[in-house]
């Protein structure tokens, strides 16, 4: 698909529901003691995998993704292996859940997911008493023999919300308390939701302490996904004739790293929280920002914006001076090696960028000429290059653009709504 330069970008929009929160709402409602009602769930390939696995384990769902009733039942051992598709969140969070049930399960995924490391969840869950068998002890497919678990104190080697969540979910049914200590703070949806559901959870800095507990069903409305909004917010800042407002979007402080970095760069940007419903929800406004300054992304913000970091490179193209991202080696372990895919494709578009093992550096005030790019089936990279096309000189041809359906099925539809060509 060829994305051509836009004359003007303007509009008020709401983005699809939050993917991270949808996964957790589905899982926690299946673990609750009584029924739950969930509103505004994101239906995409990743969240369908979580839903289908829970259904195969015995959970009953009624209604559609706009309003879903969830009737939990004790999990029963499934006969078939459980398919996680392309979803790392499904795999890692469900590993934590399944580790705490005395039954045998097998998780498998597509070719991309089968290359992503799972040792990081296997290790703490084995310390708690579960048994795992995986390809090279690190990759899917992965067999889990659940057990009655014991709580542990665990220092995660990387700041990862998925690893932290896997251990906390396992800890719900363990004997004794579970403690997770991270090297830096990662997104906190799991502990925030558990605390709101009455589970004894204490958070001090990067340390989370959880006591085993049961909880009742709940009602929740999922806010818009800040990671999806990010593409439009960045477009609003770098396009020479733009004004964009995103409403009903989640503004959890562990997810607003990109907004903080854009402020540091001098973007014409503001956001406000308008309501709290288990999670803060609000509005983001952005307009053309001709005086962007390059920035070294502060290390503590890196885990809070891991999915948005490649967009910083796009901001850096139009900023004055150098923009540097380091300590982000985690980007190489996503749906693609995002550092390599970013650098290779930016060079194809005529942008000079330097690659590091753990990040990249870009010198500003360049232009994006245009050309053809291959996001390698990675939904976030496909969306990034589409935004690049709108601010390019000649347009950008995005190969395999349909992969955006992994997280944002109506991305191009919303883009057409704000673009005036």
UniProtKB/Swiss-Prot annotation:
Keyword Amino-acid biosynthesis: yes
Location in the cell: Cytoplasm
InterPro entries according to UniProt: Enolpyruvate_Tfrase_dom (IPR001986), Enolpyruvate_Tfrase_sf (IPR036968), EPSP_synthase (IPR006264), EPSP_synthase_CS (IPR023193), RNA3'P_cycl/enolpyr_Trfase_a/b (IPR013792)
Alphabetized HAMAP family for the sequence: EPSP_synth (MF_00210)
Gene name as annotated: aroA
Signal peptide range in chain numbering: none
The protein's name in its UniProt record: 3-phosphoshikimate 1-carboxyvinyltransferase
Domain of life: Bacteria
Listed GO MF terms: 3-phosphoshikimate 1-carboxyvinyltransferase activity
UniProt keyword annotations, A-Z: Amino-acid biosynthesis, Aromatic amino acid biosynthesis, Cytoplasm, Transferase
Family: Belongs to the EPSP synthase family.
Major subcellular site: cytoplasm
Disulfide bond sites: none
NCBIfam families for the chain: aroA (TIGR01356)
Gene Ontology cellular component list: cytoplasm
Pathway the protein takes part in: Metabolic intermediate biosynthesis; chorismate biosynthesis; chorismate from D-erythrose 4-phosphate and phosphoenolpyruvate: step 6/7
